[in-house]
């Protein structure tokens, strides 16, 4: 499935990053962590993970997934917007997981500043976002030329398509302005 492919590619990059950050246990923040699939796997490696999500249902699912895997003691759960996580952390974290969230945030630069503020010096950010260029390419390949010419307006109010697909160059610029150093990039999928 697409989700399995995304996870496989993610872990191809994430595992070396975890190794590079140290033997652990690391303090990890999964900001907007949803059902906790990645957070639970990181906790299984012995790291201490704080997962935050705006949805009470997602936090409950993540908590259950952690309990099912026997890692609930390695995890802390916070129901809040990722923008508000700073007030819930006792100290800076070593690694931030921020996957499939930036494209839903109306003020992405402020969000990135918040994440920067909770990261320890020398820490890392794993960022995955919905690439607007991939959306464009997909629509061109399937022949949606009129839709592309209209600027690809969002068709429905309630869809799984994000509100703010991001241009990679714009995101890279925001990161560099904030002081982040980009050490790697991987395309996950187009279709």
Report each predicted region and the residues it spans.
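Short alpha-helix
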Residues: 162-179, 185
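Conserved class I S-adenosyl-L-methionine
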Residues: 24-32, 124-151
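Class I SAM-dependent methyltransferase SAM/SAH-binding core
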Residues: 37, 41-84
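A conserved beta-strand element that flanks and buttresses the S-adenosyl-L-methionine
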Residues: 97
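Conserved alpha-helix/loop element of class I SAM-dependent methyltransferases that forms part
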Residues: 4-24
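A short glycine-rich, Lys/Arg-flanked "PGG" loop and its adjoining helix->strand segment in the class I
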Residues: 109-124
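Short catalytic micro-motifs in class I SAM-dependent methyltransferases
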Residues: 100-101
């Amino acid at each position: 499935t697409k989700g399995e492919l995304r996870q496989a590619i993610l872990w191809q990059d994430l595992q070396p990053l975890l190794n590079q950050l140290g033997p652990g246990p690391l303090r990890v923040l999964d900001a907007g962590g949803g059902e906790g699939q990645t957070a639970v796997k990181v906790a299984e490696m012995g790291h201490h993970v704080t997962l935050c999500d705006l949805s009470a249902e997602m936090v409950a699912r993540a908590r259950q997934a952690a309990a099912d895997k026997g890692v609930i003691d390695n995890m802390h759960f916070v129901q809040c917007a990722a923008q508000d996580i700073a007030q819930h952390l006792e100290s800076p974290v070593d690694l931030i997981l921020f996957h499939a969230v930036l494209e839903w945030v109306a003020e992405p630069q402020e969000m990135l500043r918040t994440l920067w503020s909770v990261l320890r010096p020398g820490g890392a950010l794993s960022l995955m976002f919905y690439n607007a260029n991939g959306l464009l390419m997909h629509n061109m390949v399937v022949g949606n030329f009129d839709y592309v010419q209209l600027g690809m307006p969002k068709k429905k109010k309630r869809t799984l398509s994000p509100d703010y697909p991001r241009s990679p160059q714009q995101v890279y610029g925001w990161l560099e302005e904030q002081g982040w150093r980009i050490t790697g990039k991987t395309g996950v999928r187009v279709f």
